[in-house]
């Protein structure tokens, strides 16, 4: 029982179920029901064999035996729930619990033999259900052999009563400790979380008692578009008295008009479905609150994403993309900062957020023994899809990800690409308001990848999609705005075209000259574009030599009319020895590499400055 519950935690299955709308009390109710069926089966088998075989101690007091066995079985269910809170690894839980079962059985027997043969156990011993059960079996065997003294009858009543008390203690302890214990995956509650309804009532429906968030700790090298986005979110936060939006979906922030074209939201009528304000995540290297080995995964991320938008979050490995999504989806608790999704505060209203959330995690989280259809049906029910629409919804999802022919196959028998499509289908099921897609097309072939792009594009209207990917082509094709992260910070922000113009190396004209006519071709291009810059001497190809000229930018760009340039090239290219030519715009890959390299240089500079500071401190000492 314990191992299965821990396995769901370890493999993030429980976390994904929560993200898809499962309330924890329903989760524990399902665990109790399933484990109760298992223990009831074994208990009934034990009773049938014992009573049918006329075992002496069972035949003498059958009613007491049945009550003892069933109460003990039920107490073990709640004890298993409590024990599962303290484990993160399935193997460890199995080994430790197997050992503890033996210890409890031996301890109860040894205590009875050594000291309590003819007198009652102290009642507090029975807070441990296995000890109470062991003692109860001893008393029953003693009754069968020598009769039941009055102290033994009273002790048996105490045992039965304490087993009931144990169930209550174990249940509430499990629910409370599970809520407040720090989790490997998921956000724990504060110790007094159960007083939240009282606080809400006293504060007139609001839980937000924090002071306005600080605007400090701004990167001195922050990009202008990132600064505009931060100021936009600050304006919204200041308008609400220093708190993120919370309370209901209708309270999501309205986007004021932005003067920065291509970077922040452009329409004053659209809602921000995601507001992230100074979000920060630090992985501690030790037990102390701060140490030199701390790793800052996300550094003061301030961002707003609106409805009807597919936002691309790019960056090299370790940039903080997946960590940011993990915080937004409640998988990791932020070290500091605030965020709201669909108008609900991430710190206090995650249950409401989960009802409106769809998640495709970076790595597939699936039950290998379920079929594709069963998996989608399960999550459709979690999302509250009406019963009469379940079959229709599942069939639509199967068609969308092209898995209709494999719907009866178990997940464990699918290829990695097919499992990825199942994860994408799960994120889209139930019509969520905001969808997080963490590298959704990893491992897919080109044709399937294009189909998934179409599916994601169709899902964009009336909702917000946050996409991370290492494919610049995918980001270009799907995303209205793109943000690039490096070393935990948001380095740039804007539409694909805006970023290409701002960080790209300018438009380029590639032209191929016939062998021996390279200089004539270059002279022709220089005549047509006097302010252009030839990039290199040329690259030898099979049919000639390819050269590249960078077109002028800024004020000089106005002197180059592309329509006239194309007409002149059509007229003069052949006479100048130019075989073919093509205009090439900056790619997102160029922008990505430029941002990544600049961030590396900046990071090396910071490390060098830190080293110099340490050296000066050592010299001063």
Q: What role is predicted for each listed range?
A:
Residues 329, 337-345, 352-353, 357:
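Conserved ABC transporter NBD signature motif
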